[in-house]
Regions:
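Active-site-proximal structural scaffolding
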Residues: 13, 77, 108, 155, ...
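Auxiliary, metal-adjacent structural segments of Zn-dependent hydrolase domains
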Residues: 103, 107-169
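Active-site recognition of the HExxH zinc-binding catalytic motif
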Residues: 20, 184-201
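Short pre-active-site segment immediately N-terminal to the catalytic Zn-binding motif
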Residues: 169-191
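Residues forming anionic-ligand binding surfaces in small-molecule and nucleic-acid pockets
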Residues: 84-93, 164-175
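Short, solvent-exposed loop/turn and secondary-structure capping segments
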Residues: 21, 96, 173-175, 199-201
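Generic detector of contiguous secondary-structure segments
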Residues: 16, 147-150, 184
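N-terminal low-structure segments adjacent to metalloprotease catalytic domains
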Residues: 1-129
Length: 201
């Protein structure tokens, strides 16, 4: 993973950061540039880039960044989109009336963004699956299992379903031991299931 720097204080920042730990400048990932941007917030939906090479551009935070703090990507301010290139791929999330579900969702989105960063670097970034007949798009469902409705992680026709319980470290480690696996990670699930998606294209 590439290291980045804050345009305000030059401190090193990381892909997951939403604020510089040194000067508290707002940060966000600019997907079109494959770069972390530093921003001055003129309003909740108008952020001015402080990076010299982006100073003529205006951005806004992804809806899930602004309202749920589960994302740190930004979108061009003039765009009609409200979701970033990562969040737009997520079709279903756990119900948010349970605080644990918000934590699980956040962890899943974080792992998905790391996976998508790699896809960007390889120039095979997936696009959203807008309807069931679209064989080239990709969609993610993050589902919580229920007593009579277990959730199996897998891929089918451009839809990747992940058991959101995998974001619970205890559940995931218990499953790893039960399955006799050397390791079991959220990022690994994204890589594995996306392999089926790309193979089918």
């Amino acid at each position: 993973m590439k290291f980045f720097s804050c345009a305000s204080c030059q401190n090193q920042v990381f892909f997951a950061n939403s604020q510089c730990v040194s000067c508290q400048t707002t940060l966000g990932y600019i997907a079109s540039e494959k770069d972390m941007g530093s921003f001055e917030q003129h309003s909740p939906v108008l952020w001015l880039a402080l990076n010299e090479k982006y100073q003529t551009k205006r951005y806004k935070p992804c809806y899930n960044y602004q309202h749920h703090q589960v994302c740190n990507w930004v979108i061009p301010a003039e765009s009609n989109d409200i979701y970033c290139e990562s969040c737009v791929l997520t079709y279903t999330i756990p119900t948010l009336d349970n605080p644990d579900h918000i934590v699980y969702w956040s962890r899943l989105e974080h792992a998905k963004r790391r996976f998508l960063y790699l896809m960007q670097r390889l120039n095979i970034m997936p696009r959203p699956k807008y309807n069931d007949d679209d064989r080239y798009g990709l969609r993610f469902n993050f589902l919580m299992p229920e007593a009579e409705h277990p959730v199996l992680t897998g891929h089918a026709n451009g839809v990747i379903t992940l058991n959101a319980s995998e974001a619970d470290v205890i559940y995931r480690e218990t499953t790893r031991i039960k399955m006799g696996e050397n390791y079991r990670t959220l990022l690994g699930h994204f890589r594995h299931e996306s392999g089926h998606y790309y193979f089918d294209l």
